[in-house]
Amino acid sequence: MSLVDVDGLSLRYGARTVLSRVSLSIAPGEIVTIVGPNGSGKTSLLRAIIGAVKPFQGRVTRGAGVTLGYVPQKLHIDETLPMTVARFLRLPGGASEAEIDQALAQAGVRDLSGSQLAQLSGGQFQRVMLARALIGKPDLLLLDEATQGLDQRGSASFYQQIEQVRRDTGCAVLMISHELHVVMSASDRVICLNGHVCCEGTPAVVASAPEYRALFGTGTGGALALYRHEHDHEHDHHDGCAHGQATEDRTEAAE
């Protein structure tokens, strides 16, 4: 039984088609990474899944009793507003101190409860946002460009924490990124989106490949991997995805 089923989903903003006939499903406990260029409809897909936008065609079906946790791409907090992490996590549902402590521990920032939001680093703030999403004990965790603005080491650390969250809680994870060449090595599936589903498959884990180490750097603990784009079709609408040749070009450039 799937947690979420997306069947033939099409979205339009005015006269512009953002998504066309997208179908996918998320099973309990799996990690799915959606990759694609800017403007490919990734965030729109997430918004449709959480019910923030209505489909033009198709439907999104959520399993009975399935709960979602959502980490947005960005959240602006007034830096002049004095607010501790604990106070932020209590809004708006009034989470208990025990629930806050557990969520912060699961996000890997147990000691930040009394810290001011305005004083957090980008990586710490993303962990706090993750903790906020985990308070409700979601069946499916959705993350929209969760590592945007983080350096490579920070991104790898965050990905590793997501793997730990899945192991600890059993929740499924749906992550999106615009970086076609970087995905979680722990992903069960990778879906390439560019207005429609271009392709999907498992990511290649490349821990020992020197050219990929040169591209992604060291110290990532295998959390970053390369997804090779190999398509057997041509696109009849939207701009084309970044295919295998583009990936190879990036690798050569990095060397």
From Swiss-Prot:
Keywords: ATP-binding, Cell inner membrane, Cell membrane, Ion transport, Membrane, Nucleotide-binding, Translocase, Transport, Zinc, Zinc transport. ATP binds at G36, P37, N38, G39, S40, G41, K42, T43. GO terms for molecular function: ABC-type zinc transporter activity; ATP binding; ATP hydrolysis activity. Disulfide bonds: none annotated. Gene3D superfamilies: P-loop containing nucleotide triphosphate hydrolases. It is an enzyme of class 7 (translocase). It is found in: Cell inner membrane. It is a peripheral membrane protein. SMART domains: AAA. Its main location: membrane. GO terms for cellular component: plasma membrane. The complex is composed of two ATP-binding proteins (ZnuC), two transmembrane proteins (ZnuB) and a solute-binding protein (ZnuA). Part of the ABC transporter complex ZnuABC involved in zinc import. Responsible for energy coupling to the transport system. Belongs to the ABC transporter superfamily. Zinc importer (TC 3.A.1.15.5) family. This is Zinc import ATP-binding protein ZnuC. The gene is znuC.
